[in-house]
A protein has these predicted regions:
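Short glycine- and acidic-rich boundary segments immediately preceding or forming the N-terminal edge
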Residues: 1-33
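Conserved beta-strand scaffold positions in the cores of enzyme catalytic domains, especially
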Residues: 19, 33, 75, 152, ...
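A residue-level signal for conserved active-site and pocket-lining positions in enzyme catalytic cores
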Residues: 28, 97, 208
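Active-site beta-strand termini and strand-to-loop segments that position acidic
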Residues: 34-38, 201
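Active-site/substrate-binding loop(s) of hydrolase catalytic cores
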Residues: 39-43, 52-186
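Glycine-rich N-terminal segment of FAD-binding domains in flavoprotein oxidoreductases
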Residues: 46
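Active-site-adjacent mobile loop/cap segments within catalytic or ligand-binding domains
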Residues: 164, 190-235
Length: 235
């Protein structure tokens, strides 16, 4: 295939093309996707936890460098825009979207998370009134059923690892490229998570966890990798 040329840095302040909508959030904000020019082989999404904005920043910077659509990769910059604009891990209804997917282990109730990586996991959020109770969750499920990507990369922070339950070649290459540990799980149970939902459906899901670092360090470390993922189907 012909290599995708990158825009000059002076043009990185804006998007060359506009996204389409695949739904709306609880607050009515469009859920946006940049679709590939060809068959969707890979979906990369960021910002399902609004308190992890560095994932959105990095993926946005990578996407803004392209002169044309990715040939193979769909991009979602903010799977939880309500949480992103409010600075909360959950959505506007206080639901952790990454515990709201209809998995065999989903349970109603609350789930905890850490306020900072150094604190105990004691901050409460809801898992939702029922599995897939949230519009953001349902929209992402419907989108994936339509796109039928061969794999999904979910961007998170700050656990500093490549989490791939399938130990796939793509996950292994990503770990080598980023110098992040390659693990089969993050060390604790995640009922109702997107990764579990994908696994139950035979959809390979790789969780790309950024390390705890300054924003500029994050951009330095991860934007070039994301550009490669967007432009090179053989990554």
């Amino acid at each position: 295939m012909t290599a995708i040329h990158l825009r000059p840095r002076t043009d990185w302040g804006t998007f060359l093309r506009q996204p389409t909508s695949y739904g709306t959030s609880h607050l009515g904000i469009p859920l946006e996707i940049w679709r590939p020019s060809g068959t969707c082989e890979l979906l990369i999404f960021a910002g399902i936890h609004g308190e992890e904005p560095e994932t959105t920043y990095a993926l946005s910077r990578a996407l803004r460098q392209l002169t044309e659509p990715s040939p193979h990769c769909a991009v979602i910059l903010a799977a939880n825009p309500d949480g992103l604009i409010r600075g909360t891990r959950g959505n506007a209804r206080g639901v952790d979207l990454n515990r709201n997917f209809p998995t065999r282990d989903w349970r109603p109730g609350t789930v905890t998370h850490r306020s900072t990586i150094h604190d105990p996991s004691d901050v409460l959020l809801s898992t939702g009134g029922h599995a897939a109770s949230e519009p953001e969750t349902r929209a992402l499920i419907s989108l994936i059923e339509t796109l039928a990507p061969k794999a999904v990369i979910a961007l998170h922070a700050p656990l500093a690892c490549i989490d791939d339950a399938n130990a796939s070649p793509l996950g292994e290459r990503l770990a080598k490229r980023t110098n992040l540990p390659f693990v089969r799980d993050v060390g604790y149970h995640t009922p109702g998570s997107f990764g579990t939902w994908g696994g139950e459906r035979g959809l390979p899901v790789i969780t790309y966890e950024f390390a705890l670092a300054s924003t500029e360090q994050q951009m330095h470390d991860h934007v070039p990798v994301l550009v490669e993922l967007l432009t090179n189907p053989a990554f």
